[in-house]
Structures are given as structure tokens and as C-alpha cells.
């Protein structure tokens, strides 16, 4: 398939710039993957879409304040986006500056603070920085960093973003982008789902800035996927196996939960699913045979992105494009702070071997 197969026109006005005041007030477009039928509602309709015994798998990563502004000794401005914490005093970053700095260069970080750092190494397009202070780098980021809003939200972060660009159940700091499908869950909804007998389990995938990298190859199979850290525990494995045994659905909350579960399944030998922790660069696109996930809760994604390719692989290419057309016609809100979909798996999606325009 070609990159252009995943293109669509999206009015700029539909790109959500701010979150809703109440997380669960967003709209929900439900797509039956097998039949292609769609129904519209609100996010709390999940209480009726999900059944007793279904298993929700959520990603419990937390976003670090990864965007930091700083200065060179010359006074020139720079900006870093932390991609990964390497050690208590070393981080791997994307660096934006008028000129590429040399190894050994020193900077001062913080809007008003003057935290000294040194450029220690370069790894392809990323730079390794050392914090030259005693404080832990992660703790320093909490005080000097900004919430790294996505490129399609071209504004400075605001106090509400520090709360609403995090899931209510996030526990493990390490992401530079939110697992956005999870942003719609608030505690009252989670409690109501639990009361209805819906089970929950938590994977961890620290979303990297690579999630926003565009696909540049015309033949999508030639795209090289970015790498992220993921963890699927024995507790999650047990919950998935129990869910399958009782004939219920594993419902992934977000594409990161999908990628975590399907990575663990791919790495498993001689059984259905075993625990996994490590790097994943799994790229799911049409033709992929899903092994674990039965239903998916996800936001509306960018044209030509690896995320819409994953959705097409799950729901079927034609179903997905029809759903997106409906969402645009009905003025759903798109991307990180936008509305959501609930999709049941299309068992014939992997056999869709040609694109109809």
C-alpha cells in the first residue's frame, strides 16, 4: 500500500486545541468492524458497549515535562525535548538551535533557572546531555520543564495541560506524549465500569517523540518505526488469559496498549502470551494479523500516520476511511485533545489486499 492511500483532507478547525473541562464528555463514534455499521454517542456510552467480564488494557505511563528552554554561553536561545532518561544525570534529547553545538558544549537550562548541562555525545539525530548538578534530572525537569504539547497544538502549555494531558491512572514517568485515548477516562467512569464487572489491567509504554514523526516512504512497508520502551507484566498476561478463557474481549485503550500487547505476543514462543519488557518498534499496518486485541478505544489520528495505518489494520481500510469521513462531516474533534472511537475487530481486515478509492 502507498502512503497516499492514508491521506484525507481535514479542516484545521477540527484539530482540538484545548481539552474539554470534563474528560468523559467527549463524543464517541462506535464502529462495528465486522459489519461496518456506525453509531454515535458520548464516551460514557462505554458502560453499554462493554460487557461484564471484558478486560480493559490501559497504558499507565505518565508524561514528563520534557520541553525545556535554555541559553548558550553566547546568549543564543535553544530548546530541548527530552526523549529518554538514561540515568539520574543523563538524558537523550532532541535539540533545536540556530547552529548544531559541538561535543563538550555547555548550556544553561530553565526559563529563569540556570541549570548547567554539558553535551556529552550524539546518537544519530539525538543528543546526550549531562546535568552538572547534584539533583536528579527527572526531579529538575519537574521544576523547569514544560508539558510537551504535540506539534499540531502550536501554543504554550498552560496550567490545565499539566492535569489534563495526563491520564488519571498514570503512574510511571517516562513519556513525552500522552497515551491520548486514556485521557477520556475519569475516576467516576472507571468506578462505574468496575461496578459493571469490567476488568482492568495496565501495561506501560513510554511514548516517544517519534510518535509524531511523519512516514516519508511512499511504500509504507519500507518505513522504519521508532523504538519505545514497553512492559507487559505477568499480571497483565494472567488477566488476558483469564479474559480469553471466559470468552470475553480484550479491549485495548489506545494504540500504545495495542502495540504493547501485540509485541508481547510476537515475542512469545510456544505459548499464547508471556511477559515482555524492552524496546519495541512494532509497525502495524494493513495485512497484520492481530493476535490479542478484540476491540480498540482510540482517538482520531493524523493523515498518513502510522496510527491510522494501525486502525485500518484493525477495523479494515474501507471501514476506517468511511468512519473518518463521517467524523469530518459531523465535525468530530481530532487528535490528542479530540473525540474518540470504539472499534470492534474486523476479522477480515487482514485479507483486504487492495485499495478502493
Swiss-Prot record:
Matches recorded under InterPro entries: QueA (IPR003699), QueA_dom1 (IPR042118), QueA_dom2 (IPR042119), QueA_sf (IPR036100)
Pathway recorded for this protein: tRNA modification; tRNA-queuosine biosynthesis
GO terms of biological process kind: queuosine biosynthetic process; tRNA wobble guanine modification
Classify the main location. Answer: cytoplasm
On the tree of life, the source organism's domain of life is Bacteria
Gene Ontology terms, cellular component aspect? cytoplasm
The record's subcellular location field reads: Cytoplasm
Q: What is its EC number?
A: 2.4.99.17
**Enzyme category, top tier:** transferase
Function, as annotated:
Transfers and isomerizes the ribose moiety from AdoMet to the 7-aminomethyl group of 7-deazaguanine (preQ1-tRNA) to give epoxyqueuosine (oQ-tRNA).
**Official protein name in the record:** S-adenosylmethionine:tRNA ribosyltransferase-isomerase
